[in-house]
């Protein structure tokens, strides 16, 4: 299983749930091992692989059905495929899996050639799910066209992100960033949704004002090469750091001065919760649900605003003094411990119901 935002959220829950009561197995749509596979196996789970999701492929649907049919021990199937969440739930229903959860993670989708197909399958989710979850209100209402769903917070282990000046100094030294430099950061997959093209345009403008500024991009994805080409064409290659996938995101956030997130759409991004937990000012687009604001560190601009406006705001936010926000994150309901306990109890109660023990 890869190291994206959704996968990170699932691992946060998996690490903190009582695995003597609830165990997770993961079915992924990639035919190769991912970053989290070894940890999942070490924690007692299994990782199974299918080919890329293709609802029009007879062989794909056959493989999916055969997998579920071969695992009658599963009484709960929890699907995290957004618009396509109903597809595995359809075969779970056909194979008499009693508890089928669809989970919404986005408040829209990329409007590409697949968009009409996604909307078609979105309409069929509720036919096959008997429980609806969402990462936030906007995501749930968009995905399910109802307000009858449970919001499960994209919770994190907030203590791991608490601002630490020593870590900040060490990480900036590691990347050769001086104390007087502005370090802008972003964590996210190189995918159209994350709007890296505009992000680079914003940084390019900031760099004209502040030549001693840097941009750190954490992640991988299909658009990484084209973004690297754009950075090179703008002459910014010495000031843009591509870290790739990292297991120390909590420490990288300490090194940043402003977290930039100009997405085209989102559900409730866990990366914004992580950034706030690190006491990091966040500048987000008006397409990111404002419900992600759990502290006074989140600021919003329109995607229609100029790159000058965005660059000016980054400069302003870079002067904010960092602080410990752990209690604020905990009080907002986004610390993982209580959330994992709730999910554990939910699964156990459902399982008992499925076995007729209640």
Annotate each language-model stretch with its function.
Residues 1-62, 222-223, 346:
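N-terminal strand-loop element at the rim of the active site
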Residues 245, 264:
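Aromatic "clamp/platform" in nucleotide-sugar-dependent glycosyltransferases that forms part
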Residues 127-167, 300:
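Donor nucleotide-sugar binding/catalytic pocket of nucleotide-sugar-dependent glycosyltransferases
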Residues 79-85, 104:
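Short His-centered aromatic/hydrophobic patch
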Residues 27-28, 272, 281-285, 290:
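Short hydrophobic beta-strand element within catalytic cores of glycosyltransferases
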Residues 4-12, 182, 186-205, 222-229:
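A conserved mid-protein helix/loop that constitutes part of the nucleotide-sugar donor-binding site
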Residues 64, 162-177:
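A short helix/loop element that forms part of the nucleotide-sugar donor recognition site in Leloir-type
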């Amino acid at each position: 299983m890869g190291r994206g935002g959704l996968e990170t959220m699932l691992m946060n829950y998996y690490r903190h749930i009582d695995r003597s009561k609830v165990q997770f197995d993961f079915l992924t749509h990639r035919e190769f091992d991912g970053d989290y596979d070894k940890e999942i196996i070490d924690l007692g789970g299994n990782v199974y692989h299918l080919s890329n999701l293709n609802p029009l492929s007879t062989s794909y649907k056959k493989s999916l059905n055969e997998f579920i049919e071969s695992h009658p021990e599963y009484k709960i199937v929890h699907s995290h495929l957004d618009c396509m969440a109903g597809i595995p739930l359809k075969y779970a229903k056909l194979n008499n899996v009693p508890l089928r959860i669809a989970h919404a993670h986005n408040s829209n989708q990329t409007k590409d050639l697949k968009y009409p197909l996604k909307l078609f399958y979105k309409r069929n989710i509720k036919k096959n799910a008997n429980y609806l979850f969402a990462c936030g209100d906007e995501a749930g209402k968009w995905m399910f066209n109802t307000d009858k769903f449970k919001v499960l917070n994209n919770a994190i282990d907030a203590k791991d992100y608490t601002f630490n000046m020593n870590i900040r100094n060490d990480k900036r030294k590691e990347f050769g960033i001086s104390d007087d430099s502005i370090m802008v950061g972003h964590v996210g997959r190189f995918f159209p949704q994350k709007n890296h093209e505009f992000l680079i345009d914003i940084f390019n403008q900031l760099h004209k004002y502040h030549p001693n500024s840097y941009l750190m991009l954490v992640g991988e994805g299909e658009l990484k090469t084209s973004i690297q080409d754009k950075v090179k064409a703008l002459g910014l290659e010495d000031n843009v750091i591509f870290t790739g996938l990292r297991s120390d995101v909590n420490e990288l956030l300490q090194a940043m001065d402003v977290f930039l997130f100009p997405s085209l759409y989102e559900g409730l991004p866990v990366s914004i919760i992580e950034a706030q937990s690190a006491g990091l000012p966040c500048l987000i687009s008006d397409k990111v649900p404002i419900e992600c604001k759990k502290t006074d560190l989140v600021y919003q601009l329109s995607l229609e605003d100029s790159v000058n406006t965005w660059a000016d705001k980054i400069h302003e936010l870079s002067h904010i003094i960092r602080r410990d926000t752990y209690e604020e994150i905990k009080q907002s309901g986004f610390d993982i411990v209580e959330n994992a306990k709730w999910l554990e109890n939910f699964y156990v109660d459902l399982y008992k119901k499925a076995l007729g023990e209640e």
